[in-house]
Amino acid sequence: MNPNQKIITIGVVNTTLSTIALLIGVGNLIFNTVIHEKIGDHQTVVYPTITAPVVPNCSDTIITYNNTVINNITTTIITEAERHFKPSLPLCPFRGFFPFHKDNAIRLGENKDVIVTREPYVSCDNDNCWSFALAQGALLGTKHSNGTIKDRTPYRSLIRFPIGTAPVLGNYKEICVAWSSSSCFDGKEWMHVCMTGNDNDASAQIIYAGKMTDSIKSWRRDILRTQESECQCIDGTCVVAVTDGPAANSADHRVYWIREGKVIKYENVPKTKIQHLEECSCYVDTDVYCVCRDNWKGSNRPWMRINNETILETGYVCSKFHSDTPRPADPSTVSCDSPSNVNGGPGVKGFGFKTGDDVWLGRTVSTNGRSGFEIIKVTEGWINSPNHAKSVTQTLVSNNDWSGYSGSFIVENNGCFQPCFYIELIRGRTNKNDDVSWTSNSIVTFCGLDNEPGSGNWPDGSNIGFMPK
């Protein structure tokens, strides 16, 4: 480096250091100004007082400083908005049903990342709606998924995941060990009823606010089971329908009232009308209504009306257009107080909504298999009337496509409960031509609005040939 370059380099370094020093000085000045202003806002300074000397012949002056600093500390407490128990509300008016969510779980499972499930349902809290399902402890197309056609194994558990999403590793929460379940939100906390154990000695564990709070033991020792859809809560008391006993003979049916996770009472469902009842789909329309499955004698569906104290009414949906599967061709018998005794068993989980004397019924399009899905409105179908007529038919899944269970759920919306339902779209070993070792499902959901709906077809849509075996 020649002398000129050295001089230039030294000059540049000197200028840089000077600039840094200047910036530090300016920053220090600003900092001190701000600090003094804050101290001025928050302290009271008593200026020095001069005290005369105590010792004679001494020229010293004693200066006493009395500094008092007052710090004003403001504490802000953020409290969560107080939650209230869900009230009793009527159903919102509706004229048809509109697509809400579709999870496409089987199509998305082509790469084996999707959890094998069945018996799905939907339930909502104050903020979100959630999908629930009974998982099989296996991923689609893996070796552990072979044989997942079985209903009850110790590997099944109730899981929850965001509605409209497929159940994959990373987006689900395991709730409890269960091969039968029901869930509901009381306005403050979630409650889950989870059945598991040996067929002849099962128990139901009640989970409330994430803690196990109570249990129900099998009393008939014959597959204790519950709704496979949401229970319902009014003013903090939740109502759950439970069955124990044969699937195709006389069984025991109970309604349990549970508050904050504790059983407060139960009643036996009277057998004067209902011969068999399981897998109820319940909703609130001031009282709790449950539309259920008769797996023994009825292709018409049994129902109950319940409040927070007792079972108020029971019967069978009167409509001559039946909604279980299998069922006779339309029209069939009108039977309001007993099962139809026509194509009575086995059956499939389903739902209905009462609107005055009319009734909306979901059902498979096929009369003898789980394919297709439609919802019909039967004028005066809730009562014994000669005027039963299908005034509305919405075909939502064509008869060329597989369906399965269906059930109701409700969403609080502007002072009433919006009626909604889901359709389980089963794929796998239960279906002819589905040449795979597993059984699983996707779902599609619909909600009612007081508008005229359009039309469409919303099947599972997966090409089974693309799927892992």
Swiss-Prot record:
Catalytic activity annotated for this protein? Hydrolysis of alpha-(2->3)-, alpha-(2->6)-, alpha-(2->8)- glycosidic linkages of terminal sialic acid residues in oligosaccharides, glycoproteins, glycolipids, colominic acid and synthetic substrates
Bilayer-spanning residue ranges: 7-29
Q: Which organism is it from?
A: Influenza A virus (strain A/Tern/South Africa/1961 H5N3)
Q: Where does substrate bind?
A: 118, 152, 278-279, 293, 370
Q: Which GO terms describe its molecular function?
A: exo-alpha-sialidase activity; metal ion binding
UniProt: Ca(2+) binding residues = 294, 298, 324
Annotated region described as Involved in apical transport and lipid raft association, given as residue ranges: 11-33
Function, in words: Catalyzes the removal of terminal sialic acid residues from viral and cellular glycoconjugates. Cleaves off the terminal sialic acids on the glycosylated HA during virus budding to facilitate virus release. Additionally helps virus spread through the circulation by further removing sialic acids from the cell surface. These cleavages prevent self-aggregation and ensure the efficient spread of the progeny virus from cell to cell. Otherwise, infection would be limited to one round of replication.
Question: What's in the domain note?
Answer: Intact N-terminus is essential for virion morphogenesis. Possesses two apical sorting signals, one in the ectodomain, which is likely to be a glycan, and the other in the transmembrane domain. The transmembrane domain also plays a role in lipid raft association.
Name it: Neuraminidase
- Per its Swiss-Prot or TrEMBL entry, what cofactor is needed? Ca(2+)
- Which stretches face the Intravirion side? 1-6
PTM note says: N-glycosylated.
Q: Which residues are glycosylated?
A: 57, 66, 72, 146, 308
Per the record, the similarity remark reads: Belongs to the glycosyl hydrolase 34 family.
* Organism phylogeny: Viruses, Riboviria, Orthornavirae, Negarnaviricota, Polyploviricotina
